[in-house]
Swiss-Prot record:
Lineage, top ranks: Eukaryota, Metazoa, Chordata, Craniata, Vertebrata
Post-translational modification: Glycosylated.
EC number annotated for this UniProt entry: 3.1.1.3
Lumenal side: 23-398
Function of the molecule: Displays cellular triglyceride lipase activity in liver, increases the levels of intracellular fatty acids derived from the hydrolysis of newly formed triglyceride stores and plays a role in very low-density lipoprotein assembly. Displays serine esterase activity in liver. Deacetylates a variety of arylacetamide substrates, including xenobiotic compounds and procarcinogens, converting them to the primary arylamide compounds and increasing their toxicity.
Organism: Oryctolagus cuniculus
Name of this protein: Arylacetamide deacetylase
GO BP terms: lipid metabolic process
GO MF terms held by the record: deacetylase activity; triacylglycerol lipase activity
Length: 398
C-alpha cells in the first residue's frame, strides 16, 4: 500500500534527478549520469548553503571537493614531494629508475574553473604519477590561489611565477631536466592558464629557457562570446552546463553577480572593445562541421561600467584567444584536445584555426564521443582513450 506508493515516488524522483538524455555515441552512459548526479548534488548543496547565508557557493564546492585530496605518497616507481617554487606550492613527481640522460620536464596546471581543485586531488595525483612513470618525465604539478578569495590576475601570476622558477637553469639541473625539452600542460581552466603563461613567456626577456611544447586539454580560452554553437548545443550537458561555466568565468574576475548576469545574456562586452570580436568570430574560425546550421548573432554590447570595474575579462592573460596574430606566431609545438559534448569545444577549435593561420604546428585531437572532464574520470573508457592519445603525443614531442 503506502510503502509501495512511497517507494514508487522516491524511485521516480530519483530517476528524474539522475537521468539526463544523452547522445547515442556516449560510451558508458549510466556511469556519466552517476558522475553528473554527484556533481549536481555538490552544486545543489552549495546553492543551499548560499541560500542559508552560511557560506558562499564556491567555498562550499571547494570544501566538498577537498575530500578527494590525497597526500604526496611516493610509490615503487615515482618519488613524490611537496615544495614551493617562488612561494607557490607545487608537487614534484620524479621517476625512480636511473636515467643515463637528462629527463624531459612537464609543468602541469590543474583545472577547476579558477575556483576549486588542487594538485592533491586524487585524479590529478594519479595523472601526474602515470605521466612521470610511463613517459619517464619529471612532472611539476602546480597549485595557485583560487577565487572567490583571490580574483584575476592572481591565478595567472601564481602559475607564471612557479613556471619561471622551474625554468631556471639551477632548478632544472637539480631535478635532472633537459632545458630544451620542457612542456606546459593543463586541462580546462588549467588549459586556459597554460596557454596564457605560454603567451607571456614568449614576450618575457628575463626567461632564457623557452618551452618546447604546450598541450591544452579542453581549454577555456575566451570570455567574449557565450553564444558559440558549443554553448548552444551543450547548455545542459552533464558535468559542465553553460550556466555553471559562466558562473566560473565571472567568479574568476569578481564575486559581483552583475557580471555573471550580463555574461549569461551575452551582453557584457562594451562597444569600445568591439574590435576584439574578430578574434572570436566563430562564423569565420570554425570548420563547417562545427557550425551545423547555426546562425552567427552579432553581439549586443554591454555596459562600459562593467568593463571599467572588471577589465580582466578583456585581458589577453585571461582570454588567450584575444592575442593578435603577431603574438601567436612565436608559439611552441601545440596539442589541443576538444570534446564534442563540451561548452568549451569551440574555444579550442577556434584556437587551433588561429594558431595554424599564424603558422604554428598544431595537433588537434577532437573526441567525437568526449565530454568535459573526460581525462579526470579515470574509470571511463573514454578517459583512458584520451589519456593514451595525450601520452603518445607527449612521448613523441616533448
Amino acid at each position: 500500500g503506502v510503502k509501495t506508493v512511497l517507494l514508487l515516488i522516491v524511485g521516480v524522483l530519483g530517476a528524474y534527478y539522475v537521468y539526463t538524455p544523452l547522445p547515442d555515441n556516449i560510451e558508458e552512459p549510466w556511469r556519466l549520469l552517476w558522475v553528473n548526479a554527484h556533481m549536481k548534488t555538490l552544486t545543489n548543496l552549495a546553492l543551499f548553503a548560499e541560500y542559508l547565508g552560511s557560506n558562499i557557493f564556491m567555498n562550499t564546492v571547494k570544501f566538498l571537493t577537498s575530500f578527494q585530496e590525497v597526500p604526496p605518497t611516493s610509490d615503487e616507481n615515482v618519488t613524490v614531494t611537496e615544495t614551493t617554487f617562488n612561494n607557490v606550492p607545487v608537487r614534484v613527481y620524479v621517476p625512480k629508475r636511473k636515467s643515463k640522460t637528462l629527463r624531459r620536464g612537464l609543468f602541469y596546471i590543474h583545472g577547476g574553473g579558477w575556483c576549486v581543485g588542487s594538485a592533491a586531488l586524487s585524479g590529478y595525483d594519479l595523472l601526474s604519477r602515470r605521466t612521470a612513470d610511463r613517459l619517464d618525465v619529471v612532472v611539476v604539478s602546480t597549485n595557485y590561489r583560487l577565487a572567490p578569495e583571490y580574483h584575476f590576475p592572481i591565478q595567472f601570476e601564481d602559475v607564471y611565477d612557479a613556471l619561471k622558477w622551474f625554468l631556471r637553469q639551477d632548478v632544472l639541473e637539480k631535478y635532472g631536466v633537459d632545458p630544451e625539452r620542457v612542456g606546459v600542460s593543463g586541462d580546462s581552466a588549467g588549459g586556459n592558464l597554460a596557454a596564457a603563461v605560454a603567451q607571456q613567456l614568449i614576450k618575457d626577456p628575463d626567461v632564457k629557457i623557452k618551452l618546447k611544447t604546450q598541450s591544452l586539454i579542453y581549454p577555456a580560452l575566451q570570455t567574449l562570446d557565450m553564444d558559440l554553437p558549443s554553448y548552444r548545443e551543450n547548455a545542459q550537458f552533464p558535468i559542465l552546463s553553460k550556466s555553471f561555466m559562466v558562473r566560473l568565468w565571472s567568479e574568476y574576475f569578481t564575486s559581483d553577480r552583475s557580471l555573471e548576469k550580463a555574461m549569461l545574456l551575452n551582453q557584457h562586452v562594451p562597444v569600445e572593445s568591439s574590435h576584439l570580436f574578430k578574434f572570436t568570430n566563430w562564423s569565420s574560425l570554425l570548420p563547417e562541421k562545427f557550425k551545423k546550421g547555426h546562425v552567427y548573432n552579432t553581439p549586443t554590447y554591454g555596459s562600459s561600467e562593467l568593463a571599467r570595474k572588471y577589465p580582466g575579462f578583456l585581458d589577453v592573460r585571461a582570454a588567450p584567444l584575444l592575442a593578435d596574430d603577431a603574438q601567436l606566431r612565436g608559439f611552441p609545438l601545440t596539442y589541443v584536445i576538444t570534446c564534442q559534448y563540451d561548452v568549451l569545444r569551440d574555444d579550442g577549435v577556434m584556437y587551433v584555426t588561429r594558431l595554424r593561420n599564424a603558422g604554428v604546428q598544431v595537433t588537434h585531437n577532437h573526441i567525437e564521443d568526449g565530454f568535459h572532464g573526460a581525462l579526470s574520470y579515470n574509470g571511463f573508457k573514454t578517459g583512458y582513450r584520451v589519456e593514451k592519445q595525450y601520452f603518445e603525443w607527449l612521448r613523441e614531442n616533448v
